Amino acid sequence: MVTYKDAGVDIYKEDKVIRALASQIKFERTDAIKPADLKGHYAGAIEFGDYYLVLCTDGVGSKMVVAEMANKFDTVPIDMIAMNVNDAICIGAEPVALVDYMAVEDITEDIASQIGKGLNDGIKESNINLIGGETASLPNMIKGVDLAGTVLAVVKKDEIVSGKEVKPGNVIVGLRSSGIHSNGLSLARKVFFEISNLDVKSKLSHGKTVAEELLTPTKIYVKPVLEMIKQVNVKGLAHITGGGFRKLKRLNKDVCYKIDELPEILPIFKEIQNLGNVADQEMFKTFNMGIGFCVIVEKDDAEKIIEISNHHNIAAFVIGKIEESVEVNGETKRETVLVEYNNKKMIME
């Protein structure tokens, strides 16, 4: 069975590397401009009067490799923006501005124009301004193009959604993803291009080509989630990216997140699993599996969350609940994420 690690990505090693880096960051300002207590969350924030200024930074990873193979660059900028703004809204902040960074080996005017179109589409959907950026020509350092960005968002101090209010009895509403989004591309590429000897133009069993599936842009959840925050007492918000539902542990770590009512898995994930003989647990540790964002609320508020999401043409479902503990193989587990799928109980560590 092929794994994400076989494809060159070790998420546990990445966790250790991040901890090693963070352990050396000890300096903090001592004046009134102080960081919010959000370590380990989706975004960082600093105090600014009655507000927090929120910053997120991210890129598109190896999705750009597929863009180069297909010579199609107009969707990956949407992915870059989505990865940033979807993280910012996880603490209830409204994204307002973006700066981008593009590193290139060489680039044509046509590719630049495609990237520009994608940037415009992404900022329009997110309702943010692109206020600057940097393009670096680095022919001796990289091959192709890499694209990243940083988003500024704002939230009133008394309106921040930290996830600390998540408690047993709450329910988890999952918002549909558009597909693979921007995580797990290394494993997907290994399955399609190495194991199955397909190319970007190859048709998959459900009719779409490999390029169409892998280059479908990440769903931007800004508008529906900001509306939800205004209308409902939201307890926690989670962008489901690398590591899958493990991301829920960024919220309240003292509870169990039980995912036991998942909707139909999207075709792209079935293709990857079948062609690569990928285990269920590996799939759920690597991909979003059709749920790109989670909203945690009181049970009575779930219907309103689903209504708002549907109004924005995003399907939504109650996919689970918060519990004090869960039972797995006769053992009581606490402070964890449990996914029940295909008659299996899988702990997402």
Swiss-Prot record:
Q: Quote the catalytic activity from the record.
A: 2-formamido-N(1)-(5-O-phospho-beta-D-ribosyl)acetamidine + ATP = 5-amino-1-(5-phospho-beta-D-ribosyl)imidazole + ADP + phosphate + H(+)
Q: Name one GO biological process term.
A: adenine biosynthetic process
Q: Which residue pairs form cystines in this protein? A: none
Q: Where mainly found?
A: cytoplasm
Please name the GO terms that the record assigns under molecular function: ATP binding; phosphoribosylamine-glycine ligase activity; phosphoribosylformylglycinamidine cyclo-ligase activity
**Annotated transmembrane regions:** none
Q: Where in the cell is it found?
A: Cytoplasm
Which GO cellular component terms are attached? cytosol
Keyword set for this entry? ATP-binding, Cytoplasm, Ligase, Nucleotide-binding, Purine biosynthesis
Q: Which InterPro entries does this UniProt record tie to the protein?
A: PurM-like_C_dom, PurM-like_C_sf, PurM-like_N, PurM-like_N_sf, PurM_cligase
Q: In which pathway does it act?
A: Purine metabolism; IMP biosynthesis via de novo pathway; 5-amino-1-(5-phospho-D-ribosyl)imidazole from N(2)-formyl-N(1)-(5-phospho-D-ribosyl)glycinamide: step 2/2
Tell me its EC number(s), please.
6.3.3.1
| Entry annotated with the keyword Nuclease | no
What does the similarity note say?
A: Belongs to the AIR synthase family.
Q: What is this protein called?
A: Phosphoribosylformylglycinamidine cyclo-ligase
Instruction: Give the species this sequence originates from.
Output: Methanococcus maripaludis (strain C7 / ATCC BAA-1331)
List the lineage, top down: Archaea, Methanobacteriati, Methanobacteriota, Methanomada group, Methanococci
